[in-house]
Amino acid sequence: MAKDVRLGLDAREKMVEGINVLADAVKVTLGPKGRNVVLEKSFGAPTVTKDGVSVAREIELEDKFMNMGAQMVKEVSSQTNDVAGDGTTTATVLAQSIVREGMKSVAAGMNPMDLNRGIHKAVEAVVKEIQKMSVPCTTTESIAQVGTISANSDSAVGKMIAEAMEKVSTEGVITVEEGSSLHDELVVVEGMEFDRGYLSPYFVTNQEKMVAELDNPYILLHDKKISNIRDLLPTLEAVSKAGRPLLIIAEDVDGEALATLVINNMRGIVKATAIKAPGFGERRKAMLQDMAVLTGGTVISEEVGLTLENVTLDMLGETKSAVVGKDSTKLIDGAGAKADIEARCAQIRSQAENTTSEYDSEKLQERLAKLAGGVAVIKLGAATEVEMKEKKDRVDDALHATRAAVQEGIVAGGGVALVRARSKVKVKGDNDEQQLGIEIALRAMEEPMRQIAANCGLEGSVIVNKVMESKDNMGFDAASETYVDMIKAGIIDPAKVTRSALQNAASVAGLVLTTGAAIADLPSKDGASADAAAGGMGGMGGMM
């Protein structure tokens, strides 16, 4: 396919046009007085949002070179959202400012490579200052404040997230779901829950709820398929003598083995329930091992020389209770030793920190939460589907931001941290062009505060100058349009969010400034001729 090649300034100017289109649409959402953006949907009602990354993701431009620029800045907001969960609009505003000022210098004949080095030197120095300024976020009150800010000043959401973190610890899993009422509610699930249900409805003990409830059960953990009942007989006899129920968690249970378990259950000989082990492959083995640690049992695996015929009661795990539904199973209050559980948590935490795969990291965090704290579910209520979607976006953002705050601490919000950090930076470039790059980056750090003020209908320069004349955490509270101590007023940002926004913005802005050529596909001529043919057909139809 033929390509359209643009070189130098021609390529960069088109990309910058695209960047400005995307950034101008996103930045209207910044701050407590930011505006909503309405997104058209192919089906159903449009979505109304104040979430920067949701706006950015919707933007696709017709001009391919403009679209390249827009997609690069979209990457800034997506990357910031993935790493820190918030700060997407801030990152976009920073990237636009660095590109805009940098392009003026490149057009004036400056070396873009040196400008880029200067920008990165400034960002590195400011990031160090932000890390020095950060205050640990450990209290329920400060966690609630972070959640409130990230949920666009919705204090109820902030409080609910703080309460969820308090109940399941900062390690626990907190999920956000659409509820069925008009009110938000927090549901805390104790113990370990996973998405596997009973293999036969004949295992159900509570017909009303359609669940199998097992009190003080033994738990048999096996990493292979169980088809032959003879393999299970020694275990069933031992459990029957003990007079306790049995929960079998294996790769699968079918055929003769499943039929015998069902018959024994119906006749009341042994109260047993069988489920498939969660996960697949290596992850299944790891999750079975987690269950073994939690319940104080042993995974019966041929890899370690254990077979079903040799199982004794002390190899079985135990819990206070187990509830098995159609699609999920919950193990409550396992009999595993606390020291063993803590050691297993430390091992999983270490794996999560060292993995490069985002998917693996997410799954490891889930496993950690199930072992360490439990699961909290925030069920959202809203009057309409449009409101529900918008609220879910906000709560997801707030949840990510509070996690980021717990990890790296908090700094003054409202763009104050960037302005304070830039005033402390004394970095020098190796030459005039690097120095100019440093100045471009430092000037861009005022931009989020200017935009917050602009969204209030105020002059950004006046606000920035007034904040720079004051000290410490004094800043501009856009909600009340007053100057306050930002940390005391609870207007705070996670340090990780501010840091990620700045680093990602500088990274993409540097790429745009150092672009020497851009290549895109030319429009297909076949498409044009096909359109012409279609037009001709229509004309003929009119003649008949």
Curated annotation (Swiss-Prot):
Complex and partners: Forms a cylinder of 14 subunits composed of two heptameric rings stacked back-to-back. Interacts with the co-chaperonin GroES.
ATP-binding among keywords: yes
Entry GO CC: cytoplasm
Residues annotated for ATP binding in this entry: 29-32, 50, 86-90, 414, 477-479, 493
Known EC number: 5.6.1.7
A molecular function (GO) term: ATP-dependent protein folding chaperone
Family annotation (NCBIfam families): GroEL, PRK00013.1, PRK12849.1, PRK12850.1, PRK12851.1
Catalytic activity: ATP + H2O + a folded polypeptide = ADP + phosphate + an unfolded polypeptide
Name of the protein this chain belongs to: Chaperonin GroEL
Top-rank lineage group of the source organism: Bacteria
Organism: Hydrogenovibrio crunogenus (strain DSM 25203 / XCL-2)
Gene Ontology biological-process entries: protein refolding
Role this protein plays: Together with its co-chaperonin GroES, plays an essential role in assisting protein folding. The GroEL-GroES system forms a nano-cage that allows encapsulation of the non-native substrate proteins and provides a physical environment optimized to promote and accelerate protein folding.
Pfam family, any one: Cpn60_TCP1
Protein family membership: Belongs to the chaperonin (HSP60) family.
Cellular location(s): Cytoplasm
UniProtKB keywords: ATP-binding, Chaperone, Cytoplasm, Isomerase, Nucleotide-binding
